[in-house]
């Protein structure tokens, strides 16, 4: 399976760095926009003008279930800009964590799948998708 790299987006977590006792506290995360086919997003749908540049700055709320949580607004904004492509659009989250991205994809009626190496997070993601966690 091959993908075309479209853009890298940087999420500046502001004052909410991910907890990582093994390295300097990371306060940014990278988002890679990859597509299999050409895709023309509608940036006018973005919930905020802060989300149309390549650096997004907003804080995450602490989550005791995961050391690097992010709010639903992050995947929501991306999916709002491409939501017309529901028939062939698939969301893949290679680091699914507690399932936030998958939950948002499900709410948009998009096809989705995720990968997660940590079995506890897999369980939490399933609970998120089944509506029993959050």
Where are the model-predicted features located?
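Core catalytic lobe of class I
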Residues: 1-124
